Amino acid sequence: MQNGRALACTPRKFAGKLQVMDVAVILPGGRGWGPVLKLAEIAAEHLGGRLIKIPAESLPAGRLGKLATLLPPPRPRGEQKLLVIASIGDHLNAVLRSGVRRHYSYVAGWVIDSFWEARIPRVARSRGWYDHLYVTDQQDLDMWAAAVPCPVGVLPWGADVAGAQASWADKQVELQRVGRQPQVWDDDDAVAGAAANAGVSFAGRPPFGDTDEANQAFVETAYRQAKAVLAFGTRTARAKYNHPTKDYVTARWTDSLAYGCLVAGQVPDTPTAREILPSFALVQLSDTDVAQGLEQLKAALTQYDEEKFTAIRTWAREHLDWRSRLDQIAADAAVN
């Protein structure tokens, strides 16, 4: 546990006593996980604990991980509590690292990509390793609840709304591309040409940074300047790393709303998406015809003004901020 670092912060108070939780996040390597790392940093600060960064390659896996779960978990010796933020189910194996489970009286796990049924790990299915688990979409709840012995809750993807610095004066780009897109929207040069012909200002994908933190900073600058962010669900914007049939909300939608942007494209068709994404901030675009989509966007932009920008930010603050999710985790830990 020596790779954790102390953060100066105020613990949350529940049930008449301070609740402090350490936060472990697994670093999978590669780009694209910046939002998860940022969530972990916010969580450690908000919950008053240490932030512990664990390289994915150090997790027990295969035969070693299986053998570890054949024995009952060690009896905890302390009263400390731990939240494991797992980008994928396999990252829950963090509690199998030597000494981890003995150190904590209560361990919760929050699985971000919770849609993979085949990737619910043995450690989650085994009694005593986790006290509470959370998934990010209601559509995943039943399969996890049927597979694991501990309580399972739904905590949707959110955003650092409190930290999102944006003003109406910043909004100079009418359409900002972020992330994967359907084939007809994927060529930034072609879309830029079509947008110019339609009288729409367009910015292609943000540059990639040398680190996750730098990459995240580029993306946040793009959100800050955008009136609308281009985003399509996995049904129309396939990639080999996506689930082949399930749709789901990612950071593009929630971060866009945190910065007061419209989200233009096609919304994931899930119960949680319908709950947390406000219809007044969504613009349906064609996934097969860029010219048609740009006309749909232009119509929506005529209704996008400072009042709507403020309304979107207000919605995000009330429904999407990570800290409200973390308060639920702390409250559940206090009950236990």
What are these regions (language model features)?
Residues 4, 11-73, 78, 86-95, ...:
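Nucleotide-sugar donor-binding catalytic core of glycosyltransferases
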Residues 83-85, 109-110, 176-178, 313:
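Short catalytic-loop micro-motif centered on adjacent basic/acidic residues
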Residues 99-104, 124-128:
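Short, conserved loop/helix-junction motifs that constitute active-site signature segments
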Residues 100-114:
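Active-site proximal beta-strand in glycosyltransferases
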Residues 144-145, 293-297:
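C-terminal helix of von Willebrand factor
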Residues 250, 281-289, 300-302:
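Conserved acidic donor-binding segment of nucleotide-sugar-dependent glycosyltransferases
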Residues 288, 299-333:
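A charged, aromatic-enriched C-terminal amphipathic alpha-helix characteristic of glycosyltransferases
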